[in-house]
């Protein structure tokens, strides 16, 4: 019937929902967090590195943020076209996604919190 059965190593998130997963974690600068992602019919290990504290200015205001850089656990590019992602979450209890940046070999997409 075309159905496949896959073993799932615990909780698995899609590439977008991992941002919301991170919002509920006690994130510490310099620490790394591991989770599994389901994307393009594959389950992949993703390592999320908390790399910096930065002040980010967007239309919604100025925020103290944690800079988060997810990488693939297998060393392969995380996104299509050799893409990389960076996420800036507000460094407070809300953990708002203030800025998300995706770079690929065809360009860069930047999303910023408006209000």
Where are these regions (language model features)?
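Acidic, serine/threonine-rich low-complexity disordered tracts
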Residues: 24-115
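Contiguous hydrophobic, core-forming segments of folded domains
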Residues: 1-29
């Amino acid at each position: 019937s075309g159905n496949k059965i896959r073993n799932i190593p615990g909780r698995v998130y899609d590439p977008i929902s991992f941002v919301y997963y991170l919002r509920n974690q006690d994130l510490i600068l310099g620490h790394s967090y591991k989770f599994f992602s389901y994307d393009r019919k594959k389950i992949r290990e993703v390592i999320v590195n908390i790399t910096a504290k930065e002040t980010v200015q967007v239309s919604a205001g100025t925020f103290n943020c944690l800079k988060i850089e997810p990488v693939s656990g297998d060393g392969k590019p995380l996104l299509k076209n050799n893409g990389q992602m960076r996420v800036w979450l507000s460094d407070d209890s809300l953990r708002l996604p203030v800025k998300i940046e995706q770079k690929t070999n065809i360009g860069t997409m930047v999303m910023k919190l408006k209000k």
